Amino acid sequence: WLTSQPQPWRATVALDSAAYHVEKIMQNRHSRFYDQAFGDQPSNWKALSPISQLHQALPAFLAVCSTTRPDQPCTQAQQFIQHAQKLGTKAQLLPLPLSHFEINKSLGKDNSYTQAVNQFIQTHSFTIE
């Protein structure tokens, strides 16, 4: 049913994830949300943890994060970005003084945040022929 091969995955824009290091989250005090998402089996946490699974370069990666959240997602995002860069990934951090809700709601509006995300996408886009 495919008339041509899919184009390669070019880039990721991660919006305010606070779960780059699942093992660390689960070993410390955390929201019940994480128990629902990742379960109560420590043996599974490493397999579910993006930073633990990062062993080779990824396509370009932009981590958008909130600087106002008490769980400090920018700290985890920065650690992930640094690890990805060491492996050769073109990775960037975009910290914003917005809540998680505001990060999701304001993307696409006429603001500097949307412009930064668009610039990242354009930098890593390609022409489909």
What are these regions (language model features)?
Residues W1-Q5:
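Short glycine-enriched nucleophile-adjacent loop
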Residues Q7-A19:
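A conserved short beta-strand
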Residues S17-Q53:
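Mobile cap/lid helix-loop segments that gate and shape the active-site cleft of serine hydrolases
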Residues T68-Q72:
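Acidic catalytic loop of the alpha/beta-hydrolase fold
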Residues A57, L62-S66:
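Short beta-strand/loop motif that positions the catalytic acidic residue
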Residues P6-Q7, H55:
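Alpha-helix termination/capping residues and helix-transition junctions
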Residues P50-L58, T75:
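Conserved serine/cysteine hydrolase catalytic core
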Residues V64, T75-I81, Q85-E129:
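C-terminal catalytic histidine-bearing segment of alpha/beta-hydrolase fold enzymes
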